[in-house]
Amino acid sequence: MKREHQESFGGGVISNNNKTNTNHLNSSKNINFGECSSMQNTNTKQNMWREEKETNGGGMDELLAALGYKVRSSDMADVAQKLEQLEMVMGSAQEEGINHLSSDTVHYDPTDLYSWVQTMLTELNPDSSQINDPLASLGSSSEILNNTFNDDSEYDLSAIPGMAAYPPQEENTAAKRMKTWSEPESEPAVVMSPPPAVENTRPVVLVDTQETGVRLVHTLMACAEAIQQKNLKLAEALVKHISLLASLQTGAMRKVASYFAQALARRIYGNPEETIDSSFSEILHMHFYESSPYLKFAHFTANQAILEAFAGAGRVHVIDFGLKQGMQWPALMQALALRPGGPPTFRLTGIGPPQADNTDALQQVGWKLAQLAQTIGVQFEFRGFVCNSIADLDPNMLEIRPGEAVAVNSVFELHTMLARPGSVEKVLNTVKKINPKIVTIVEQEANHNGPVFVDRFTEALHYYSSLFDSLEGSNSSSNNSNSNSTGLGSPSQDLLMSEIYLGKQICNVVAYEGVDRVERHETLTQWRSRMGSAGFEPVHLGSNAFKQASTLLALFAGGDGYRVEENNGCLMLGWHTRSLIATSAWKLPQNESK
């Protein structure tokens, strides 16, 4: 199957596992035009590739095959020789012509690299087509090179598909590119002097990670398409190819592609039940808190809205739909302790899932918070509720007391209710019966709840690529400063555990369906619609919260790539141009809250 693919050619660096071959192919960049030297190099190539042929049996080169190029091991000597000839032919043209060629001309996909190079040589230099096997005509190597750079040579590039390669060249152009280079007297030779690095604009064929990255993304999308079309045989072949392409990448791209490959494999081969308990999930959550500003931003912006809503109240009650390790509340307690006129009585209701070992983790968190409250002089009361789903909560269980100001807080919790129809509506009805002064919601800014698998996969790929990029960028700065605020782990350990934390989400979004797919993130626009339908009104997060959130990011290592954006009274945190999480605040209309 042929496809159009734009490439830039002029020299080549092609690597495989044979170091001798790699060094030889790299020599195509500096070509000696002395006859004896050319003969010796060609003989060396012949011997090297003859041995390669005997070793590999003339099969396809595995590394180049993984990158999409079909080159038999027995043909690689010819490919190397022809790439040298191709560079010399194209080098005789004007620099402007080559630039024009690389940018305005469409070259067809050179998956069959041997035939493609031969075709290019034929089109650029018809005389070279008469030499089918360079290794069989060793005596004419010098003649070939000399003819290639004949001052009177003219090559018609109009045969290449696309626009004319370059305007008619002036005479004696090639002669201007030749000069004598002083060598030891024993080996006099006339060679082409390589131009200075800053002036070398000739395109070079490289097996680089950028091209492989494009192939990787296309293969990921093709695999998702095959799964949606239930072509599991094709999907299985593609997912194996994804793993190979991912191994050729570095940094965030390699990591995120590997997690998506694992998720696709789970969907193809089945989903063995995961046995990771909630305590381990909370450990991953804490490492994610340390390695990035996302949870810090979520806690800060929600606390600011709650603090403003509690202004003047003598008794306050916070209901946290996902207490976890209680990391959000020390900052709020300290802010309440500094309130003019003295701190209010602070009551906290924490909700969490059951533990695998049946330990009372919520009470342990409550005890630590009680110790802090005693230290800073805040009257504190804690109660924990263990439940499998916040949809199971009943308003009477929460024991709302007369005269206390109530706030409901949900950070990355409500989207899990979307797996069961009607659960979100039930939770919001419960909240309305509680009659809080404010409801704070933090959710991922992504749409991973659509009905079409490919659309969901595409959105997730873009979203988590940005998240992994931000982790990579911020933690490189953290490693340089070698700082860690809590002592939970080194920056590298926090990064690794955070990647596992996000990898679990990727797996759930891609591999699971039905009630098992709980990572059903929706956008701020979608949550606005849901909250409005449930009878809530938006609360504008003030400019003070925006300024303080921006200051928080400025203090965070690697914060240059993060940005805070105000969106119709809500605050969003993103990485460069992509918004990733959103904080919103809500209240009931005045006539309902009375």
Swiss-Prot record:
Molecular function per GO: DNA-binding transcription factor activity; sequence-specific DNA binding
Job of this protein: Probable transcriptional regulator that acts as a repressor of the gibberellin (GA) signaling pathway. Probably acts by participating in large multiprotein complexes that repress transcription of GA-inducible genes. Upon GA application, it is degraded by the proteasome, allowing the GA signaling pathway. Together with DELLA2, required to enable arbuscule development during arbuscular mycorrhizal (AM) symbiosis with AM fungi (e.g. Glomus versiforme) via the regulation of RAM1 which, in turn, regulates various AM genes (e.g. NSP1, NSP2, PT4, LEC5, RAM2, EXO70I, STR and RAD1).
Xref: SMART domains: DELLA (SM01129)
Start and end residues of each stretch annotated as Leucine repeat II (LRII): 364-396
Region of interest (SAW), residue spans: 511-587
Species whose genome carries this gene: Medicago truncatula (Barrel medic)
Family matches, as PROSITE patterns: GRAS
One Gene Ontology CC term in the entry: nucleus
Keyword Phosphoprotein: no
VHIID: region residues: 285-350
The name this protein goes by in its record: DELLA protein 1
Keywords tagged on the record: Gibberellin signaling pathway, Nucleus, Transcription, Transcription regulation, Ubl conjugation
Phenotype caused by lack of the gene: The double mutant della1/della2 exhibit slender shoots, early flowering and reduced root fresh weight. Impaired arbuscule formation during arbuscular mycorrhizal (AM) symbiosis with AM fungi (e.g. Glomus versiforme) in plant missing both DELLA1 and DELLA2 associated with a reduced expression of AM genes (e.g. NSP1, NSP2, PT4 and LEC5); these phenotypes are phenocopied by treatment with gibberellic acid (GA).
Keyword Metal-binding attached: no
Main location: nucleus
Motif (LXXLL motif): 414-418
Protein family: Belongs to the GRAS family. DELLA subfamily.
